[in-house]
A protein has these predicted regions:
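ATP-binding N-lobe of GHMP and related small-molecule kinases
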Residues: 1-115, 119-137
Length: 140
């Protein structure tokens, strides 16, 4: 289902805890997980150039890269990886983005802060692509 490209978009995703099966989901083993009330948020808009600017407010860090060079430059290069995955799914991006990321989810506390940010990022990209799509939760 195609939709119109928003000028500005805010996406929010909850963190989670594992009640049973921590670190087993990627092995295909059973997990009982539960969303928590703390959320990660991406607030962003399109740019007129091909630069991606990600302000990580909670960390006091800003990350920059060009859509023309999505080669991984560090371990866990999640934002480039997210764009690469979306491109493999057929999405295209002719312009970059300016985003601010904030999170209530504690880092390195077993509450899936990185996962929540990546789910928000993929959702944001799917809606801001040249031909936006509405993916269901399972697809994202």
């Amino acid at each position: 289902m195609n939709t119109q490209i928003p000028k500005h978009l805010e996406i929010s995703t909850p963190g989670r805890i594992c009640l049973f099966g921590e670190h087993q989901d990627y092995l295909g083993l059973p997990v009982i997980a539960m969303a928590i009330s703390l959320r990660a948020k991406i607030d962003g808009k399109k740019r007129k150039d091909r630069k991606v600017v990600i302000h990580k407010q909670d960390l006091g860090v800003t990350e920059y890269f060009l859509l023309d060079d999505l080669t991984y430059s560090k371990p866990r290069d999640y934002f480039k990886s997210g764009i690469n995955v979306c491109q493999m799914e057929g999405l295209t991006f002719s312009s970059g983005f300016e985003c601010e990321i904030t999170s209530e989810i504690p880092i390195r506390a077993g509450t899936s802060s990185s996962s929540a940010i990546m789910v928000s990022w993929i959702h944001f990209l799917s809606r801001m692509a040249d031909e936006p799509v509405v993916w269901d939760q399972q697809k994202i």
